[in-house]
Amino acid sequence: MLKTIFSLIAIIPMTLSFKKQFFWTAFISSSFLMPFLFFIFTPLSFNSSFLMHLQNKLFGYDMISAPLVFLSLWMLPLMALASQHHMKKSPLSYQLLYITILIIMQTLLILTFLSTNLMNFYILFESSLIPILLIIFRWGNQKERINAGIYLSFYTLIGSLPLLASLLFLSNTLSTLYIPILMMESSEMYHSPILWLGCFSALLIKTPLYGFHLWLPKAHVEATIAGSMTLAALMLKLGGYGMIRLSLMPFLHSPKLSLILISIALWGAVMTSFICLRQTDLKALIAYSSVSHMGLMTASIMTLSLWGMSGAFIMMIAHGLSSSALFFLANSNYEKTNTRTIILLRHTQMLLPLTSLWWLFIILTNLAMPPSINFISEITIMSSLFLWSPLTFPFLALTMVITTTYSMSMFMLAQGKLSKMTKILSPFSTREHLTLFLHLFPMIAIMAYPNMIINIFC
């Protein structure tokens, strides 16, 4: 595991040893080796989800963290491929700074997933905010990026203060924050609603829960493509991963507060789906769609059942890949048309038929068409919530209907007869087709061998 981390950091000096014209080729090629090195150096067992393989006192992995680490490593070369067109005209020093920030961000995310101590998790959890803020502030295209960065930092830091206070209280009373030990602690003396809210506050904001979601659309719209892909594929998953870890600790179970949270999450999923129907900005639409999906994930985790956590975990992987691909497609359209306004993108897919096919594939996975892993995750989530309470079914059904409506309308708006004002667009490059294929490849692999993630909690 640590070999993978050191290899990831070593990409920077290795890339510098190549000539300027091979800079991005060397970085992308070496980044592609990282997921495979992780498999080689990390012995995995698909039948021991809660057996943590400890590397030292601070870091370890199990079948909950390992897939998310692999997803983090897999996304690094995809972010580089997506950013190449945007960054190639910048000075070499800026390009080096950019990939250094990407590697630092991925390293912090991986170490967060591998943390076996809650205080260590908290420090890395908050540290991962710094690289994404740098990307938004330095490489954002519009002056609104300052406002987006302020929203992101304000929401995240305000939510982190109760989490820090709760961890200090637990450390003082239990004398440990070691996750494997806390998973065995079942004393009822720590069952406190205030402690529960403190522990989950920062995670619910990072997910984000409806009501604390205002930072996400702003951050997505103003971030570069690598920032949007990181937010969609990995940053939002930090909240879900943390909630799963804490929900596996018996002394943090609170059925009454879970009931309130499930109600808010399902209501938020419906409301953000309605908001998607009225969006005019393509990236904002995809961002609100992420809030809706994360609402379902949060509700599933709060059922406190292994079946619900399994569905939430599958959705984390599936949504990470599909939403990242959607943001890449939106950015590619923006690079060719210089607009994200949906009404101005009408008929553009008639000029790019192969691109239209990619849109269809990614949208179908995002709205959970079988046999995609998104479909498996939503069926599992619906089953767990229906078993928890049949009253949740109307909210689930309404969310799925609205999701299908705005997803297909987003696709159909780009079809139709060409306007006389439509300019000729350059076709997708091999780089763009490769990036989209590499988003779909893990989904196809999991569909072929679903036990990789389905049986983790079973």
From Swiss-Prot:
Catalysed transformations (reactions)? a ubiquinone + NADH + 5 H(+)(in) = a ubiquinol + NAD(+) + 4 H(+)(out)
Cite the GO molecular-function annotations of the record.
NADH dehydrogenase (ubiquinone) activity; ubiquinone binding
Membrane spanning segments where? 22-42, 63-83, 96-116, 117-137, 150-170, 194-214, 224-244, 257-277, 284-306, 311-333, 350-370, 391-413, 434-454
Subcellular location(s) per record: Mitochondrion membrane
* Record key words, sorted: Electron transport, Membrane, Mitochondrion, NAD, Respiratory chain, Translocase, Transmembrane, Transmembrane helix, Transport, Ubiquinone
Q: What is its EC number?
A: 7.1.1.2
Q: Which Pfam families match?
A: Oxidored_q5_N, Proton_antipo_M
Regarding the membrane, this protein is recorded as: Multi-pass membrane protein
GO cellular component terms, alphabetically, are: mitochondrial membrane
- GO BP terms in the entry: ATP synthesis coupled electron transport; electron transport coupled proton transport
Q: What class of enzyme is it?
A: translocase
Question: Could you tell me what this protein does?
Answer: Core subunit of the mitochondrial membrane respiratory chain NADH dehydrogenase (Complex I) that is believed to belong to the minimal assembly required for catalysis. Complex I functions in the transfer of electrons from NADH to the respiratory chain. The immediate electron acceptor for the enzyme is believed to be ubiquinone.
Family, per entry: Belongs to the complex I subunit 4 family.
Q: What is this protein called?
A: NADH-ubiquinone oxidoreductase chain 4
What is the primary gene name for this protein?
MT-ND4
